[in-house]
């Protein structure tokens, strides 16, 4: 499939050389049509993330996840599949995610960086 995509083609060909890309995701999965209590659905997604071997931290309105791009997004899909399997007819999810290529950085390092700024201010 060769198309003249101009600048985009250059970007795509550059990133094909990247072997792996880590990502940090903030994921919020909300099942619809299941009532107001969603704990069992959140628990199902947490199990999926644990079984995937991904580092994740649940918080009040979602879950932070870190790992290889393909593994993380495969787990997000598996979360949706698990929640649908529990009977949720519809799901809405929101994600914020970031990558960086200048150096590796974990969720813990990001938090520690801010804590250090707070301690020194």
Curated annotation (Swiss-Prot):
Entries under SUPFAM superfamilies matching the protein: MTH1187/YkoF-like
A Pfam family that the UniProt record links to this protein: Thiamine_BP
Gene3D superfamilies, alphabetized: 3.30.70.930
NCBIfam families according to UniProt: MTH1187 family thiamine-binding protein
Family membership noted in the UniProt record: Belongs to the UPF0045 family.
The name this protein goes by in its record: UPF0045 protein sll0230
Organism annotation: Synechocystis sp. (strain ATCC 27184 / PCC 6803 / Kazusa)
